[in-house]
Amino acid sequence: MMFKQYLQVTKPGIIFGNLISVIGGFLLASKGSINYPLFIYTLVGVSLVVASGCVFNNYIDRDIDRKMERTKNRVLVKGLISPAVSLVYATLLGIAGFMLLWFGANPLACWLGVMGFVVYVGIYSLYMKRHSVYGTLIGSLSGAAPPVIGYCAVTGEFDSGALILLAIFSLWQMPHSYAIAIFRFKDYQAANIPVLPVVKGISVAKNHITLYIIAFAVATLMLSLGGYAGYKYLVVAAAVSVWWLGMALRGYKVEDDKVWARKLFGFSIIAITALSVMMSVDFMVPDSHSLLASVW
């Protein structure tokens, strides 16, 4: 029973979602030549770091989680694990994860993990989430760290490919998160969390969602234009972006914003999973003839 509680507090669903993006970044950089020990070290290392961040987040948010219908039954809210024990648990998970990334992958992968962790726990969870409408924007940077870590674990350098991945996954986070805030509007309102839909209104949030999806679409194409991914990836990226944008635009005419937001959120998961899979299998070796290479 205790094992289940210690697992729940790490938010396994979030860990799994991040692993898909880590695999995408890792295999994109590997270009068909997979170092399996490095692959395992990277996956486990990122999983432990993400788990640590989630436990710290649960500790920090236990007061506001009590006010939200979705989170009122979380382990720390119900007192199934003491706050002090959760802090020790989170710290041990983080140390293990960072050590695996440093010694099993490379220092760059570890430092990227540290930066993502600091942004998520230190900046987003401790301050921005509660005090600023821009909390989601800052938090998106930490959400984009896992695929970049996977990529840089292979390359050992932060190049244009890593920058494109950072842009893709950061931009994806915004409409994804705003959709959650819309269909969980009352929860965020009750907990006094200043997300955009609550502070500025759902109509303003819809405008932001549309603009971020357009920016996301452009960013996804950069992997092919830069010579990092092939035409199969390009077709899938274009298709999911157009479909997602179409869903966003239909939001201006719907009667039930919550139903629409749930559908938009659901497709966001499909979209990022499809991109992660396609960049894993349809990679290319960038050359001097790629469009971005001539600019970069």
From Swiss-Prot:
Enzyme class, spelled out: transferase
One Pfam family this sequence matches = UbiA
Can you name this protein? Protoheme IX farnesyltransferase
How is it placed in the membrane, per its record?
A: Multi-pass membrane protein
User: TM spans, by residue?
Assistant: 9-29, 36-56, 84-104, 108-128, 133-153, 163-183, 209-229, 234-254, 265-285
What family is this protein classified in? Belongs to the UbiA prenyltransferase family. Protoheme IX farnesyltransferase subfamily.
From the UniProt record, list the reaction(s) this protein catalyses.
Answer: heme b + (2E,6E)-farnesyl diphosphate + H2O = Fe(II)-heme o + diphosphate
Instruction: Give the species this sequence originates from.
Output: Citrobacter koseri (strain ATCC BAA-895 / CDC 4225-83 / SGSC4696)
Task: Give the protein's function.
Answer: Converts heme B (protoheme IX) to heme O by substitution of the vinyl group on carbon 2 of heme B porphyrin ring with a hydroxyethyl farnesyl side group.
Q: What is its EC number?
A: 2.5.1.141
Q: Taxonomy-wise, where does this protein's organism fall, top ranks first?
A: Bacteria, Pseudomonadati, Pseudomonadota, Gammaproteobacteria, Enterobacterales
